[in-house]
Amino acid sequence: MEEGDVPKKSAADTPLLAYGRMKNREKDEGDLSLKKISPSPADFPISGSSSVFPAGRSSRRTPALMLQGTSSNAGKSILAAAYCRIFRQDGYNVAPFKAQNMSLNSGVTANGDEMSRAQIVQAQAARADPDARMNPILLKPHSDTGSQVVILGQPLGHMDVLEYFGKKRELWSAVTDSYDSLAAECDIVVLEGAGSPGEINLKSHDLVNMRMADYARASVLLVGDIDRGGLYASFLGTWMSFTDAERRLLTGYIVNRFRGDASLLGPAHEYMLDHTGTPVLGTIPYIRDLNIPEEDMAGFSWGHTDCGEKKAGTLDIAVVMLRHVSNYTDFAPLAAEPDIRLRPVRRAEEWGDPDVVMLPGSKSVVPDLDDLRRSGLADNILGHAERGKWIFGICGGLQILGRAILDPHGIESAAPEVPGLGLMDLRSTFAADKTLVRVARAETPLGVPSGGYEIHHGLTDHGPSALPLFLRADRAYPSEAERICGYVSGRRWATYLHGVFDDDTFRRTWIDHVRTDLGLTPQRRCLASYDLEKALDRLADVVRANSDMETIYRSMGLK
Protein backbone atom coordinates (compact mmCIF):
# COMPACT_ATOMS: atom_id res chain seq x y z
CA MET A 1 0.00 0.00 0.00
CA GLU A 2 1.37 3.43 -0.95
CA GLU A 3 1.91 6.10 1.67
CA GLY A 4 -1.35 7.88 2.39
CA ASP A 5 -3.54 5.05 1.06
CA VAL A 6 -6.39 4.15 3.37
CA PRO A 7 -8.10 0.76 3.19
CA LYS A 8 -11.77 0.96 2.32
CA LYS A 9 -14.35 -0.34 4.78
CA SER A 10 -17.03 -2.56 3.32
CA ALA A 11 -20.70 -1.78 3.69
CA ALA A 12 -21.01 -4.77 5.96
CA ASP A 13 -18.62 -3.16 8.42
CA THR A 14 -21.01 -0.27 9.07
CA PRO A 15 -24.77 -0.98 9.15
CA LEU A 16 -25.60 2.69 8.54
CA LEU A 17 -23.52 2.68 5.37
CA ALA A 18 -25.09 -0.59 4.27
CA TYR A 19 -28.47 1.04 4.63
CA GLY A 20 -27.29 4.13 2.75
CA ARG A 21 -26.23 2.01 -0.21
CA MET A 22 -29.50 0.13 -0.62
CA LYS A 23 -30.54 0.67 -4.22
CA ASN A 24 -34.15 -0.47 -3.97
CA ARG A 25 -35.52 2.10 -1.55
CA GLU A 26 -39.17 2.59 -2.40
CA LYS A 27 -40.96 5.77 -1.50
CA ASP A 28 -42.91 4.05 1.27
CA GLU A 29 -39.54 3.34 2.94
CA GLY A 30 -38.77 7.04 2.95
CA ASP A 31 -39.37 7.49 6.67
CA LEU A 32 -35.67 6.61 7.13
CA SER A 33 -36.48 4.67 10.25
CA LEU A 34 -33.13 2.89 10.05
CA LYS A 35 -34.88 -0.32 11.12
CA LYS A 36 -32.27 -2.29 9.20
CA ILE A 37 -29.49 -0.79 11.29
CA SER A 38 -28.09 -2.80 14.15
CA PRO A 39 -28.31 -0.63 17.26
CA SER A 40 -25.18 0.41 19.09
CA PRO A 41 -24.57 -1.67 22.23
CA ALA A 42 -24.47 1.42 24.41
CA ASP A 43 -26.22 4.76 24.40
CA PHE A 44 -23.20 6.96 24.87
CA PRO A 45 -23.85 9.93 27.20
CA ILE A 46 -23.81 13.42 25.83
CA SER A 47 -21.12 16.06 26.27
CA GLY A 48 -21.13 17.52 29.73
CA SER A 49 -21.65 14.23 31.55
CA SER A 50 -18.85 12.47 33.34
CA SER A 51 -17.57 10.63 30.28
CA VAL A 52 -18.46 9.92 26.70
CA PHE A 53 -16.03 7.01 26.38
CA PRO A 54 -17.59 3.63 25.68
CA ALA A 55 -16.85 1.11 28.40
CA GLY A 56 -13.69 -0.89 27.86
CA ARG A 57 -12.09 1.50 25.37
CA SER A 58 -8.31 1.55 25.57
CA SER A 59 -6.80 4.54 27.33
CA ARG A 60 -4.15 4.82 24.62
CA ARG A 61 -5.23 7.11 21.80
CA THR A 62 -3.60 8.45 18.65
CA PRO A 63 -2.31 11.99 19.31
CA ALA A 64 -4.99 14.42 18.16
CA LEU A 65 -5.35 18.18 17.74
CA MET A 66 -8.80 19.71 17.37
CA LEU A 67 -9.74 23.12 15.99
CA GLN A 68 -13.00 24.51 17.36
CA GLY A 69 -14.34 28.01 16.79
CA THR A 70 -16.19 30.77 18.56
CA SER A 71 -18.45 30.95 15.48
CA SER A 72 -18.85 29.75 11.93
CA ASN A 73 -16.23 31.13 9.54
CA ALA A 74 -13.74 31.68 12.36
CA GLY A 75 -11.11 29.96 10.22
CA LYS A 76 -11.26 26.41 11.59
CA SER A 77 -11.10 24.67 8.21
CA ILE A 78 -8.16 26.64 6.90
CA LEU A 79 -6.22 26.35 10.16
CA ALA A 80 -6.91 22.61 10.31
CA ALA A 81 -5.39 22.38 6.82
CA ALA A 82 -2.42 24.43 8.03
CA TYR A 83 -1.69 22.10 10.95
CA CYS A 84 -2.16 19.05 8.69
CA ARG A 85 0.57 20.41 6.42
CA ILE A 86 2.83 21.43 9.34
CA PHE A 87 2.68 17.96 10.90
CA ARG A 88 3.25 16.34 7.49
CA GLN A 89 6.27 18.58 6.91
CA ASP A 90 7.59 17.43 10.27
CA GLY A 91 7.46 13.80 9.18
CA TYR A 92 4.17 12.58 10.67
CA ASN A 93 1.46 10.65 8.83
CA VAL A 94 -1.64 12.79 9.32
CA ALA A 95 -5.37 12.40 8.71
CA PRO A 96 -8.03 15.13 8.94
CA PHE A 97 -11.39 14.36 10.53
CA LYS A 98 -14.70 16.16 10.89
CA ALA A 99 -17.46 14.03 12.38
CA GLN A 100 -20.31 16.01 10.83
CA ASN A 101 -20.17 18.74 8.24
CA MET A 102 -23.11 20.79 6.98
CA SER A 103 -22.03 22.04 3.58
CA LEU A 104 -23.12 22.24 -0.03
CA ASN A 105 -19.48 22.20 -1.14
CA SER A 106 -18.52 18.59 -1.67
CA GLY A 107 -16.30 16.44 -3.83
CA VAL A 108 -15.84 12.82 -4.82
CA THR A 109 -13.10 10.43 -3.69
CA ALA A 110 -11.31 7.91 -5.89
CA ASN A 111 -13.71 5.29 -4.50
CA GLY A 112 -16.77 7.23 -5.67
CA ASP A 113 -17.73 8.53 -2.23
CA GLU A 114 -18.96 12.05 -1.53
CA MET A 115 -17.35 14.15 1.18
CA SER A 116 -16.92 17.79 2.12
CA ARG A 117 -14.52 19.88 0.05
CA ALA A 118 -13.00 21.21 3.28
CA GLN A 119 -11.85 17.74 4.32
CA ILE A 120 -10.65 17.02 0.77
CA VAL A 121 -8.43 20.11 0.97
CA GLN A 122 -7.24 19.07 4.43
CA ALA A 123 -6.39 15.61 3.08
CA GLN A 124 -4.34 17.26 0.36
CA ALA A 125 -2.61 19.31 3.04
CA ALA A 126 -1.80 16.06 4.84
CA ARG A 127 -0.71 14.50 1.52
CA ALA A 128 -3.25 11.73 2.09
CA ASP A 129 -5.89 10.36 -0.24
CA PRO A 130 -9.35 11.73 0.57
CA ASP A 131 -11.39 9.07 2.37
CA ALA A 132 -15.05 9.26 3.36
CA ARG A 133 -14.10 8.23 6.90
CA MET A 134 -12.54 11.69 7.25
CA ASN A 135 -16.08 13.14 7.01
CA PRO A 136 -18.45 10.32 8.00
CA ILE A 137 -21.56 12.53 8.11
CA LEU A 138 -22.22 15.16 5.45
CA LEU A 139 -25.42 17.20 5.68
CA LYS A 140 -26.50 18.99 2.50
CA PRO A 141 -29.29 21.41 3.44
CA HIS A 142 -32.17 21.78 1.02
CA SER A 143 -34.40 23.92 3.28
CA ASP A 144 -34.22 25.78 6.59
CA THR A 145 -35.15 22.61 8.50
CA GLY A 146 -34.08 19.66 6.33
CA SER A 147 -31.00 18.16 4.71
CA GLN A 148 -29.90 15.29 2.57
CA VAL A 149 -27.89 13.01 4.85
CA VAL A 150 -24.75 11.42 3.39
CA ILE A 151 -23.19 8.66 5.50
CA LEU A 152 -19.66 7.50 4.70
CA GLY A 153 -19.90 8.96 1.23
CA GLN A 154 -23.28 7.55 0.21
CA PRO A 155 -26.69 9.30 0.30
CA LEU A 156 -28.97 7.92 3.01
CA GLY A 157 -32.00 10.12 2.36
CA HIS A 158 -33.58 13.38 3.49
CA MET A 159 -34.34 14.16 7.12
CA ASP A 160 -35.68 17.09 9.07
CA VAL A 161 -33.83 18.26 12.18
CA LEU A 162 -35.84 16.33 14.76
CA GLU A 163 -35.72 13.13 12.74
CA TYR A 164 -31.96 13.47 12.43
CA PHE A 165 -31.52 14.06 16.16
CA GLY A 166 -33.53 10.89 16.74
CA LYS A 167 -30.84 8.85 14.99
CA LYS A 168 -28.09 10.08 17.33
CA ARG A 169 -27.16 6.63 18.56
CA GLU A 170 -26.62 5.14 15.12
CA LEU A 171 -24.90 8.27 13.84
CA TRP A 172 -22.51 8.32 16.79
CA SER A 173 -21.60 4.71 16.08
CA ALA A 174 -20.78 5.58 12.45
CA VAL A 175 -18.64 8.50 13.65
CA THR A 176 -16.66 6.56 16.23
CA ASP A 177 -16.13 3.55 13.96
CA SER A 178 -14.77 5.87 11.27
CA TYR A 179 -12.54 7.72 13.69
CA ASP A 180 -11.11 4.59 15.28
CA SER A 181 -10.19 2.93 11.99
CA LEU A 182 -8.69 6.15 10.60
CA ALA A 183 -6.75 6.97 13.77
CA ALA A 184 -5.25 3.47 13.84
CA GLU A 185 -3.56 4.16 10.50
CA CYS A 186 -1.82 7.46 11.23
CA ASP A 187 0.44 9.26 13.71
CA ILE A 188 -1.72 12.36 14.27
CA VAL A 189 -5.37 13.19 13.63
CA VAL A 190 -6.34 16.83 13.08
CA LEU A 191 -10.01 17.24 13.94
CA GLU A 192 -12.31 20.12 13.08
CA GLY A 193 -15.40 21.12 15.01
CA ALA A 194 -18.52 22.73 13.57
CA GLY A 195 -19.97 26.17 14.26
CA SER A 196 -19.30 26.83 17.93
CA PRO A 197 -19.11 24.46 20.92
CA GLY A 198 -20.87 27.21 22.90
CA GLU A 199 -24.25 26.65 21.23
CA ILE A 200 -26.01 25.68 24.46
CA ASN A 201 -29.29 24.75 22.77
CA LEU A 202 -27.52 22.14 20.62
CA LYS A 203 -25.17 20.72 23.22
CA SER A 204 -27.33 17.74 24.11
CA HIS A 205 -27.12 16.61 20.46
CA ASP A 206 -23.40 17.28 20.03
CA LEU A 207 -21.32 14.74 18.15
CA VAL A 208 -18.86 17.06 16.40
CA ASN A 209 -17.42 19.45 19.01
CA MET A 210 -16.57 18.68 22.64
CA ARG A 211 -18.13 15.24 22.58
CA MET A 212 -15.80 14.31 19.73
CA ALA A 213 -12.83 15.99 21.43
CA ASP A 214 -13.52 13.94 24.54
CA TYR A 215 -13.79 10.70 22.57
CA ALA A 216 -10.52 11.38 20.71
CA ARG A 217 -8.85 12.82 23.81
CA ALA A 218 -7.81 15.67 21.59
CA SER A 219 -5.95 18.80 22.50
CA VAL A 220 -8.42 21.58 21.65
CA LEU A 221 -7.54 24.98 20.20
CA LEU A 222 -10.37 27.53 20.23
CA VAL A 223 -10.20 29.76 17.14
CA GLY A 224 -11.70 33.24 16.89
CA ASP A 225 -11.82 35.81 14.09
CA ILE A 226 -10.53 39.10 15.48
CA ASP A 227 -11.38 40.85 12.21
CA ARG A 228 -15.06 40.67 13.22
CA GLY A 229 -14.54 42.33 16.59
CA GLY A 230 -15.62 41.13 20.03
CA LEU A 231 -13.13 38.28 19.96
CA TYR A 232 -12.10 38.12 23.61
CA ALA A 233 -15.71 38.29 24.80
CA SER A 234 -16.39 35.36 22.47
CA PHE A 235 -13.45 33.43 23.93
CA LEU A 236 -14.69 34.09 27.46
CA GLY A 237 -18.32 33.29 26.69
CA THR A 238 -17.40 30.01 25.03
CA TRP A 239 -15.11 29.05 27.92
CA MET A 240 -17.89 29.83 30.41
CA SER A 241 -20.24 27.45 28.57
CA PHE A 242 -17.79 24.56 29.04
CA THR A 243 -18.01 22.02 31.84
CA ASP A 244 -14.93 21.44 33.98
CA ALA A 245 -14.13 18.32 31.96
CA GLU A 246 -14.36 20.28 28.71
CA ARG A 247 -12.15 23.05 30.06
CA ARG A 248 -9.47 20.46 30.78
CA LEU A 249 -9.47 19.57 27.07
CA LEU A 250 -8.87 23.19 26.06
CA THR A 251 -5.16 23.75 25.37
CA GLY A 252 -5.20 27.29 24.05
CA TYR A 253 -6.78 30.08 22.05
CA ILE A 254 -5.89 31.06 18.49
CA VAL A 255 -6.45 34.66 17.39
CA ASN A 256 -7.11 34.53 13.66
CA ARG A 257 -7.02 37.15 10.87
CA PHE A 258 -5.21 39.83 12.86
CA ARG A 259 -4.11 43.05 11.14
CA GLY A 260 -1.52 45.22 12.85
CA ASP A 261 1.06 44.98 15.63
CA ALA A 262 0.48 41.78 17.60
CA SER A 263 2.30 43.18 20.64
CA LEU A 264 -0.73 45.40 21.27
CA LEU A 265 -2.71 42.28 22.18
CA GLY A 266 -0.50 41.47 25.17
CA PRO A 267 -2.86 42.80 27.89
CA ALA A 268 -5.80 40.86 26.44
CA HIS A 269 -3.78 37.66 26.36
CA GLU A 270 -2.70 38.14 29.97
CA TYR A 271 -6.34 38.66 30.92
CA MET A 272 -7.36 35.41 29.21
CA LEU A 273 -4.65 33.47 31.02
CA ASP A 274 -5.47 35.05 34.39
CA HIS A 275 -9.22 34.48 34.13
CA THR A 276 -9.38 31.09 32.39
CA GLY A 277 -5.99 29.54 33.08
CA THR A 278 -5.58 28.91 29.34
CA PRO A 279 -3.04 30.75 27.17
CA VAL A 280 -3.27 32.24 23.70
CA LEU A 281 -1.04 29.99 21.58
CA GLY A 282 -1.18 31.82 18.28
CA THR A 283 -1.92 35.12 16.61
CA ILE A 284 -2.34 34.40 12.92
CA PRO A 285 -2.13 37.42 10.61
CA TYR A 286 -4.69 38.15 7.92
CA ILE A 287 -3.37 36.32 4.85
CA ARG A 288 -4.27 37.94 1.54
CA ASP A 289 -4.73 36.15 -1.80
CA LEU A 290 -4.39 32.70 -0.27
CA ASN A 291 -6.49 30.99 -2.98
CA ILE A 292 -7.50 28.02 -0.84
CA PRO A 293 -11.20 27.12 -1.02
CA GLU A 294 -13.10 28.32 2.04
CA GLU A 295 -15.76 26.29 3.84
CA ASP A 296 -18.22 29.19 4.08
CA MET A 297 -19.28 31.71 1.46
CA ALA A 298 -18.57 34.49 3.97
CA GLY A 299 -14.87 33.70 3.70
CA PHE A 300 -14.69 34.07 -0.08
CA SER A 301 -12.91 37.21 -1.26
CA TRP A 302 -15.11 37.45 -4.37
CA GLY A 303 -18.35 36.63 -2.57
CA HIS A 304 -19.33 40.26 -2.07
CA THR A 305 -21.33 42.47 -4.41
CA ASP A 306 -19.00 45.45 -4.02
CA CYS A 307 -15.97 44.15 -5.91
CA GLY A 308 -14.83 47.41 -7.49
CA GLU A 309 -15.30 48.92 -10.91
CA LYS A 310 -14.61 47.00 -14.08
CA LYS A 311 -11.20 47.83 -15.54
CA ALA A 312 -10.52 48.19 -19.24
CA GLY A 313 -9.60 44.90 -20.89
CA THR A 314 -11.15 42.70 -18.19
CA LEU A 315 -14.01 40.24 -18.47
CA ASP A 316 -16.99 40.97 -16.25
CA ILE A 317 -18.31 37.60 -15.05
CA ALA A 318 -21.54 37.53 -13.05
CA VAL A 319 -22.16 34.42 -10.94
CA VAL A 320 -25.88 34.05 -10.24
CA MET A 321 -25.98 33.15 -6.54
CA LEU A 322 -28.83 30.71 -6.27
CA ARG A 323 -30.45 30.40 -2.84
CA HIS A 324 -29.27 26.77 -2.56
CA VAL A 325 -25.98 27.30 -4.40
CA SER A 326 -23.56 24.41 -4.10
CA ASN A 327 -19.88 24.09 -4.93
CA TYR A 328 -19.26 27.80 -5.37
CA THR A 329 -15.61 26.79 -5.01
CA ASP A 330 -15.86 26.06 -8.76
CA PHE A 331 -15.27 29.77 -9.38
CA ALA A 332 -12.35 30.38 -7.01
CA PRO A 333 -9.73 29.79 -9.76
CA LEU A 334 -11.36 32.49 -11.91
CA ALA A 335 -11.21 34.96 -9.02
CA ALA A 336 -7.41 34.71 -9.05
CA GLU A 337 -7.14 35.80 -12.69
CA PRO A 338 -6.07 39.46 -13.08
CA ASP A 339 -8.14 39.99 -16.25
CA ILE A 340 -11.36 38.74 -14.63
CA ARG A 341 -13.86 40.74 -12.58
CA LEU A 342 -15.82 38.02 -10.81
CA ARG A 343 -18.87 39.15 -8.88
CA PRO A 344 -21.93 37.53 -7.31
CA VAL A 345 -25.41 38.58 -8.39
CA ARG A 346 -28.25 37.90 -5.96
CA ARG A 347 -30.85 40.44 -7.12
CA ALA A 348 -31.93 41.80 -10.49
CA GLU A 349 -30.74 45.30 -9.58
CA GLU A 350 -27.17 43.97 -9.23
CA TRP A 351 -27.10 42.68 -12.80
CA GLY A 352 -25.11 45.38 -14.60
CA ASP A 353 -23.81 44.46 -18.07
CA PRO A 354 -21.80 41.24 -17.68
CA ASP A 355 -19.75 39.71 -20.47
CA VAL A 356 -20.37 36.20 -19.11
CA VAL A 357 -23.11 34.83 -16.87
CA MET A 358 -22.35 31.76 -14.77
CA LEU A 359 -25.04 29.51 -13.32
CA PRO A 360 -23.58 27.39 -10.49
CA GLY A 361 -24.65 24.10 -8.99
CA SER A 362 -27.68 23.87 -6.74
CA LYS A 363 -28.90 21.46 -4.08
CA SER A 364 -32.52 22.39 -4.91
CA VAL A 365 -32.71 23.11 -8.62
CA VAL A 366 -36.49 23.46 -9.02
CA PRO A 367 -36.98 25.86 -6.06
CA ASP A 368 -33.99 27.90 -7.26
CA LEU A 369 -35.47 28.06 -10.76
CA ASP A 370 -38.71 29.35 -9.22
CA ASP A 371 -36.69 31.97 -7.31
CA LEU A 372 -35.02 33.12 -10.53
CA ARG A 373 -38.40 33.68 -12.14
CA ARG A 374 -39.88 35.51 -9.14
CA SER A 375 -36.85 37.76 -8.66
CA GLY A 376 -36.58 38.85 -12.28
CA LEU A 377 -33.15 37.26 -12.66
CA ALA A 378 -34.56 34.74 -15.14
CA ASP A 379 -35.56 37.65 -17.40
CA ASN A 380 -32.05 39.07 -17.09
CA ILE A 381 -30.54 35.72 -18.10
CA LEU A 382 -32.93 35.36 -21.05
CA GLY A 383 -32.18 38.90 -22.22
CA HIS A 384 -28.45 38.24 -21.92
CA ALA A 385 -28.87 35.14 -24.10
CA GLU A 386 -31.02 36.97 -26.67
CA ARG A 387 -28.18 39.44 -27.15
CA GLY A 388 -25.90 36.53 -28.04
CA LYS A 389 -23.73 36.82 -24.95
CA TRP A 390 -21.83 34.12 -23.07
CA ILE A 391 -23.44 31.77 -20.54
CA PHE A 392 -21.80 28.91 -18.65
CA GLY A 393 -23.76 26.49 -16.46
CA ILE A 394 -22.35 23.89 -14.08
CA CYS A 395 -24.37 20.91 -12.83
CA GLY A 396 -27.64 22.41 -11.53
CA GLY A 397 -26.92 25.37 -13.81
CA LEU A 398 -26.87 22.97 -16.75
CA GLN A 399 -30.29 21.65 -15.79
CA ILE A 400 -31.73 25.16 -15.38
CA LEU A 401 -30.55 26.13 -18.89
CA GLY A 402 -32.41 23.20 -20.48
CA ARG A 403 -35.94 22.92 -21.81
CA ALA A 404 -37.37 20.85 -18.98
CA ILE A 405 -36.63 19.21 -15.64
CA LEU A 406 -38.46 15.96 -14.95
CA ASP A 407 -38.88 14.67 -11.41
CA PRO A 408 -40.79 11.35 -11.54
CA HIS A 409 -39.62 10.30 -8.05
CA GLY A 410 -40.56 13.60 -6.38
CA ILE A 411 -36.98 14.22 -5.28
CA GLU A 412 -37.28 18.02 -5.37
CA SER A 413 -40.83 18.85 -6.34
CA ALA A 414 -44.35 17.48 -6.44
CA ALA A 415 -44.55 18.57 -10.08
CA PRO A 416 -43.51 15.74 -12.43
CA GLU A 417 -42.17 18.23 -14.99
CA VAL A 418 -41.02 21.84 -14.72
CA PRO A 419 -39.98 24.01 -17.68
CA GLY A 420 -36.38 25.21 -17.66
CA LEU A 421 -35.15 28.46 -19.18
CA GLY A 422 -35.12 26.79 -22.61
CA LEU A 423 -31.72 28.15 -23.60
CA MET A 424 -30.25 24.74 -24.47
CA ASP A 425 -31.84 21.70 -26.10
CA LEU A 426 -31.60 19.57 -22.95
CA ARG A 427 -34.06 17.61 -20.83
CA SER A 428 -32.90 16.47 -17.39
CA THR A 429 -34.55 13.77 -15.29
CA PHE A 430 -33.89 13.42 -11.57
CA ALA A 431 -32.94 9.79 -10.94
CA ALA A 432 -33.33 7.96 -7.63
CA ASP A 433 -29.63 7.08 -7.58
CA LYS A 434 -26.94 9.72 -7.32
CA THR A 435 -24.06 10.00 -9.79
CA LEU A 436 -20.75 10.28 -7.91
CA VAL A 437 -17.77 10.21 -10.29
CA ARG A 438 -14.24 11.55 -10.25
CA VAL A 439 -13.19 12.51 -13.78
CA ALA A 440 -9.40 12.56 -14.04
CA ARG A 441 -9.48 13.76 -17.64
CA ALA A 442 -12.22 15.07 -19.87
CA GLU A 443 -12.12 16.17 -23.48
CA THR A 444 -13.44 19.72 -23.93
CA PRO A 445 -14.64 21.86 -26.85
CA LEU A 446 -11.35 23.79 -26.76
CA GLY A 447 -9.13 20.83 -27.59
CA VAL A 448 -7.37 21.00 -24.21
CA PRO A 449 -8.40 18.60 -21.44
CA SER A 450 -9.69 19.38 -17.99
CA GLY A 451 -11.07 17.25 -15.18
CA GLY A 452 -13.11 17.39 -12.01
CA TYR A 453 -15.93 15.43 -10.44
CA GLU A 454 -19.66 14.89 -10.87
CA ILE A 455 -22.26 14.96 -8.09
CA HIS A 456 -25.84 14.96 -9.36
CA HIS A 457 -29.16 13.14 -9.47
CA GLY A 458 -29.93 14.38 -12.98
CA LEU A 459 -29.64 12.35 -16.18
CA THR A 460 -29.67 14.60 -19.24
CA ASP A 461 -30.80 13.92 -22.81
CA HIS A 462 -29.86 16.33 -25.59
CA GLY A 463 -31.35 17.43 -28.87
CA PRO A 464 -29.44 18.16 -32.10
CA SER A 465 -28.58 21.77 -31.26
CA ALA A 466 -26.82 20.87 -28.00
CA LEU A 467 -23.49 19.39 -29.05
CA PRO A 468 -21.98 16.87 -26.58
CA LEU A 469 -18.47 18.31 -26.60
CA PHE A 470 -17.48 17.58 -22.98
CA LEU A 471 -16.59 13.87 -22.82
CA ARG A 472 -15.04 11.76 -20.08
CA ALA A 473 -11.75 10.47 -21.48
CA ASP A 474 -12.03 7.22 -19.53
CA ARG A 475 -12.63 4.52 -22.14
CA ALA A 476 -14.12 2.26 -19.47
CA TYR A 477 -17.48 3.73 -20.47
CA PRO A 478 -18.77 1.44 -23.24
CA SER A 479 -20.56 4.11 -25.28
CA GLU A 480 -20.05 7.75 -26.14
CA ALA A 481 -23.45 8.53 -24.62
CA GLU A 482 -22.15 7.39 -21.23
CA ARG A 483 -19.04 9.57 -21.61
CA ILE A 484 -20.96 12.82 -22.12
CA CYS A 485 -20.49 15.33 -19.30
CA GLY A 486 -21.34 18.62 -21.00
CA TYR A 487 -22.80 20.42 -24.00
CA VAL A 488 -22.28 23.47 -26.21
CA SER A 489 -24.83 25.56 -28.11
CA GLY A 490 -22.94 28.50 -29.58
CA ARG A 491 -21.99 30.78 -26.69
CA ARG A 492 -24.03 28.71 -24.22
CA TRP A 493 -21.89 26.10 -22.51
CA ALA A 494 -22.86 23.70 -19.74
CA THR A 495 -21.17 20.81 -17.98
CA TYR A 496 -21.71 18.47 -15.05
CA LEU A 497 -18.02 18.82 -14.15
CA HIS A 498 -17.34 20.56 -10.86
CA GLY A 499 -13.76 21.81 -10.72
CA VAL A 500 -13.55 22.26 -14.49
CA PHE A 501 -11.76 25.61 -14.06
CA ASP A 502 -9.14 24.24 -11.65
CA ASP A 503 -6.93 23.27 -14.60
CA ASP A 504 -4.71 26.26 -15.44
CA THR A 505 -4.43 25.49 -19.16
CA PHE A 506 -8.14 24.91 -19.72
CA ARG A 507 -9.07 27.98 -17.68
CA ARG A 508 -6.72 30.30 -19.58
CA THR A 509 -7.69 28.79 -22.95
CA TRP A 510 -11.39 29.35 -22.18
CA ILE A 511 -10.77 32.92 -20.98
CA ASP A 512 -8.77 33.73 -24.12
CA HIS A 513 -11.47 32.11 -26.28
CA VAL A 514 -14.06 34.47 -24.78
CA ARG A 515 -11.69 37.46 -24.95
CA THR A 516 -11.04 36.86 -28.65
CA ASP A 517 -14.77 36.54 -29.33
CA LEU A 518 -15.34 39.90 -27.60
CA GLY A 519 -12.56 41.62 -29.55
CA LEU A 520 -10.09 41.67 -26.64
CA THR A 521 -6.47 40.62 -27.01
CA PRO A 522 -5.86 37.08 -25.74
CA GLN A 523 -3.12 36.71 -23.13
CA ARG A 524 -1.85 33.39 -24.54
CA ARG A 525 -0.17 32.46 -21.25
CA CYS A 526 -1.22 31.58 -17.72
CA LEU A 527 -1.48 34.71 -15.60
CA ALA A 528 -2.41 32.91 -12.37
CA SER A 529 -1.63 29.41 -11.19
CA TYR A 530 -4.28 27.67 -9.14
CA ASP A 531 -1.65 25.69 -7.23
CA LEU A 532 -3.01 24.40 -3.93
CA GLU A 533 0.34 22.84 -3.02
CA LYS A 534 2.14 26.19 -3.03
CA ALA A 535 -0.79 27.84 -1.25
CA LEU A 536 -0.81 25.18 1.47
CA ASP A 537 2.94 25.49 2.00
CA ARG A 538 2.59 29.27 2.26
CA LEU A 539 -0.27 28.87 4.74
CA ALA A 540 1.73 26.40 6.83
CA ASP A 541 4.74 28.72 6.92
CA VAL A 542 2.65 31.63 8.21
CA VAL A 543 0.79 29.55 10.82
CA ARG A 544 3.95 27.82 12.04
CA ALA A 545 5.74 31.16 12.47
CA ASN A 546 2.85 32.57 14.50
CA SER A 547 1.92 29.55 16.67
CA ASP A 548 3.52 28.13 19.79
CA MET A 549 4.23 24.81 18.10
CA GLU A 550 6.30 23.50 21.01
CA THR A 551 3.35 23.81 23.39
CA ILE A 552 0.95 22.37 20.82
CA TYR A 553 3.15 19.32 20.27
CA ARG A 554 3.61 18.89 24.01
CA SER A 555 -0.16 19.00 24.59
CA MET A 556 -0.51 15.96 22.31
CA GLY A 557 2.24 14.08 24.14
CA LEU A 558 4.74 14.60 21.32
CA LYS A 559 8.22 16.15 21.52
Residue ranges and their predicted role:
Residues 11-14, 18, 42, 55:
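Ala/Thr-enriched low-complexity intrinsically disordered regions
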Residues 16-17, 32-34:
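Leucine-biased recognition of intrinsically disordered, low-complexity hydrophobic segments
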Residues 3-4, 41:
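Cationic, amphipathic, low-complexity segments that mediate targeting or membrane/lipid association
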Residues 34-36, 43, 52-383, 390, ...:
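Flexible phosphate-sensing "switch/lid" loops adjacent to ATP/NTP-binding sites
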